[in-house]
Amino acid sequence: PTSLGIIFFFFFDWAISPTHPEREERLLYTQDQFREEGLFDIEGISEHRPLRAENVDILRSHFCFPTVEAVCTESHRISAGGAIRAAQLVLEKQSQRAFALVRPPGHHAMKVVHGNRGFCNINIEAVMVEWIRSHYGIRRIAIVDTDCHHGDGTQDVFWHDPDVLFISLHQDGRTLYPGSGFLNENGGPKPA
């Protein structure tokens, strides 16, 4: 039988405004629906708590100005820790698949961080990739981003990395933030 580990975010110290589209109610509603529909009663589906990303985890993939503490709240650390926990579940064979439902989001945060871009302060996908590399020695990784917005930050972080395949499936950049993600954006020059 297949198994699926689901990680929910449980801290809510980060908010833009009560009416902003990126708000905690989105995830709370999803959590409620999962429970109401009995998702966790299905054999093979289990719920897990996220880990917490430490400074060393964040700094493997980011340059934070002026400091990590200046750009990250506890929520950012737990959100990145949710992605790390999903990877850990699969790589340690505790689950065949894992899905992290976490916020705040991350795929617009670039390698150099000095504030937020598209509601993203740190790139949780990049933090997870570098954590996998550090803890398991896996170099070649594929990321498939299925958000309606182009994952421009993830693209930026791994642009010059020949060992990361990043695919962003998104709405046309001419009609939606961040206005990028076109066919000619297909990787930087190979490192010397």
Residue locations for each model-derived region?
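Metal-dependent C-N hydrolase catalytic cores
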Residues: P1-R133, R139
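Conserved alpha-helical scaffold segments that buttress catalytic/binding sites
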Residues: I84, Q88, F99-A192
